[in-house]
Amino acid sequence: MTTPPLERVLDVPRLPPRRGDSHKGDYGRVLVVAGSRGFSGAAVLCGRGALRGGAGLVTVACPRDVQDVVAAGDPCFMTYALTDRAGDLPKADVVAVGPGLGLHAGDFVRDLLAHFAGPVVIDADALAALVPGSFARSVPAVLTPHPGEFARLVGRPVTDVQADREGLAVAFARTEGVVLLLKGSGTVVTDGVRVTTNTTGNPGMATGGCGDVLTGLIAALLGQGLPPFEAAALGAWAHGRAGDLAAVRVGEVSLTAVDLLDHLPAALIASHR
């Protein structure tokens, strides 16, 4: 079989304008499955990323022992205490799973992905629960690994990944039927047929929590109707743009994930220009 030519995408996708008669149900119910003892901040940042990304409703599902801490992180999202059954989770249009969830949650992650047929963003600890060949879905999953996580998925050293980021990302996305967002300088987004290399962002974003914000942001864009490739591409661009705006105000050295959240509104406005 002939491999189709790779399309290089240069334009940043846009969200459609909101209708005047719309309501919160039109902009997606996002369920964030994240957090554990010592990592409640990951759940908060992911939930807040979904809110800033425009989701109509956000619920953060986390272990009961951190639920009160997570609930205090933002009054605009709801919380839900996780059980050991993915089938008990509240209904959602989009699921983001992984940030701070813990490596012990593999069975739960696999159960969740088996129960939920809609769009998913898989990040962080949830990636460790999966192996190549297990990603096939009716709606392509969005995977957001950093180079170390991607190296495990492809069974290659990190040095090999960094030496051929685009080539390995495209091949993996094509084989597995996913949208892959490979983080790092020049984030690569590909569905195996199209590819874009993100041009926004700066070294100040190399700090804990920034990836959690990105996961929530992409989930929100999916909830508003963007297809997986477009949601990942716009998410990467807006996330990096927020980082660039934040660096102007606080500098690269002092930049935190909360600064990204503060500047996401301006970044999304800029994406429409």
Question: What does each model-found stretch correspond to?
Answer:
Residues 1-119, 128-142, 147, 151-273:
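Small-residue (G/A/S/T)-rich helix-start motifs and N-terminal tracts that mark the onset
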